[in-house]
Amino acid sequence: MNKKDQFHSLKENPKNIRFEEFCNILNSFGFIHKGGKGSHRVFTKEGIPEIMTIQNCEGKAKPYQIRQFCKLVEQYHLLE
């Protein structure tokens, strides 16, 4: 699945996304895992001042964090 397909899939249904799948999608968009504590992981991307902090909730990603990621993709035109 390419980046556009991944993005549209996330945007259409931000629920029931596995945490590890979301981490892989962040990596495919150029975000780098910078650490975190406990169930949280911190991702950053050069040129984007916002930091993505995501958390593992029983193996799933939080829907509001997926929506935040989608807003960043649109705001910084990461699909282009």
What are these regions (language model features)?
Residues 1-2, 80:
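Absolute protein N-terminus
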Residues 11-30:
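Polyanion-binding surface elements
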Residues 1, 11-14, 51:
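Terminus-proximal functional modules
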Residues 28-55:
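A short, structured beta-strand/loop element
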